[in-house]
């Protein structure tokens, strides 16, 4: 983190925030942070390493709890300080597995009990985080009470009563903080692999048209400016998936973060008409089917994902255009499934259809579009379509040098693809 570039401040209406203390350029790194605590999300358990969050076919299982898995002895050794105490808890609760929020809070508690300062709390600590308890519905509060009971059962091997918790630590409030302050950690392909707490980054407020973006390199978080930012200007990120209508965005922001968005995009319903193009009855059916597809995708069940996507795409070929966000999400899932199953020609067919909608819905420099364009360029390269591949790989590089930065591992991969493509063009 470079503290001279940003500072904490009190906004007029939105509580605390972060603002620029120096003029910022697109692509400038504003903040880097390891998490206070993180854990593999349930769907990726056993598929990615519990420490570096990278996928690998054969993972080493922790010999004690037999739940945590690692890609190497090196990762297992580095993970031990964070895993040591939860190991007993995971072992004792088998065959049940705790919700992600329970395992995450357990790791937070152990970290706070250790008392060692964390760089992730440099501007804002876990104790400073907003809980929004006074804005929660009774149903939400009951859900938190259930989590507290689950947590107490999960942690019983290490913590038998409240006196063993950190000073002034309230479990109900702690879960409320976790729910509205945790970040979904995505891998290079933008697949959800983990969940983590980055207290200082939680100072960032939401915008449906943000001036910053976040990407991850394993569990390491990088915050960059995506456009010019003036001194004193607030730094913002988008808390949500951009492929959502204004109504969907407002509902999720209300339900999860307890505020009403009144930005220009929400007030004018910007791009909503494009997003919902096509037969309403059909896209509502696809919207419902996507819940099952996303669940299968989260558990890396690619054959089932592809089968469902193919059936939907085939039946709706004349009724839903690719710009419809639910059709677009199905195409995207179909492409990812094909890539993971080694069906590269079919993956390119689906990926190519997403390019124009992605240009419309992810304008400017957005990491999701950058990664998508890179995927399509890489598929074209493997199919021998060198001029087309070069065009898309260059476009991906222009986007990702802003969103990811030259030191990100994905940019290194992209540069190698550009060099390979250039060599093939020269040789042909």
From Swiss-Prot:
GO molecular function: histone H3K36 dimethyltransferase activity; histone H3K4 trimethyltransferase activity; histone H4 methyltransferase activity; RNA polymerase II cis-regulatory region sequence-specific DNA binding; RNA polymerase II complex binding; RNA polymerase II intronic transcription regulatory region sequence-specific DNA binding; zinc ion binding
Listed GO biological process terms: cellular response to dexamethasone stimulus; establishment of protein localization; methylation; myotube cell development; nucleosome assembly; positive regulation of transcription by RNA polymerase II
Record entry for activity regulation: Histone methyltransferase activity strongly stimulated by HSPCA.
Stored Pfam families: SET, zf-MYND
Record field: catalytic activity: L-lysyl(4)-[histone H3] + 3 S-adenosyl-L-methionine = N(6),N(6),N(6)-trimethyl-L-lysyl(4)-[histone H3] + 3 S-adenosyl-L-homocysteine + 3 H(+)
InterPro entries: H3K4_H4K5_MeTrfase (IPR050869), Hist-Lys_N-MeTrfase_SMYD3 (IPR025805), SET_dom (IPR001214), SET_dom_sf (IPR046341), SMYD3_SET (IPR044420), TPR-like_helical_dom_sf (IPR011990), Znf_MYND (IPR002893)
EC category: transferase
Binding of Zn(2+) 1, residues: 49, 52, 71, 75
Region of interest called C-terminal domain, as start-end residue ranges on this chain: 272-428
Compartments where located: Cytoplasm; Nucleus
Reported tissue expression: Expressed in skeletal muscles and testis. Overexpressed in a majority of colorectal and hepatocellular carcinomas.
Residue stretches making up the SET domain: 4-240
Enzyme Commission no: 2.1.1.354
Listed PROSITE patterns: SAM_MT43_2 (PS51574), SET (PS50280), ZF_MYND_1 (PS01360), ZF_MYND_2 (PS50865)
Alphabetically ordered keywords of this record: Acetylation, Chromatin regulator, Cytoplasm, Metal-binding, Methyltransferase, Nucleus, Phosphoprotein, S-adenosyl-L-methionine, Transferase, Zinc, Zinc-finger
UniProt: S-adenosyl-L-methionine binding residues: 14-16, 124, 132, 181, 205-206, 239, 259
Cellular component annotations (GO), alphabetically ordered: cytosol; nucleoplasm; nucleus
Residues holding Zn(2+) 2: 62, 65, 83, 87
Modified residues (Phosphothreonine): 22
Task of the protein: Histone methyltransferase. Specifically methylates 'Lys-4' of histone H3, inducing di- and tri-methylation, but not monomethylation. Also methylates 'Lys-5' of histone H4. Plays an important role in transcriptional activation as a member of an RNA polymerase complex. Binds DNA containing 5'-CCCTCC-3' or 5'-GAGGGG-3' sequences.
Similarity comment: Belongs to the class V-like SAM-binding methyltransferase superfamily. Histone-lysine methyltransferase family.
Oligomer status and interactors: Interacts with HSPCA. Interacts with HELZ. Interacts with POLR2A; the interaction may be indirect and may be mediated by HELZ. Interacts with HSP90AA1; this interaction enhances SMYD3 histone-lysine N-methyltransferase.
Stated name of the protein: Histone-lysine N-methyltransferase SMYD3
Organism listed in the record: Homo sapiens
Species classification: Eukaryota, Metazoa, Chordata, Craniata, Vertebrata
Gene name per UniProt: SMYD3
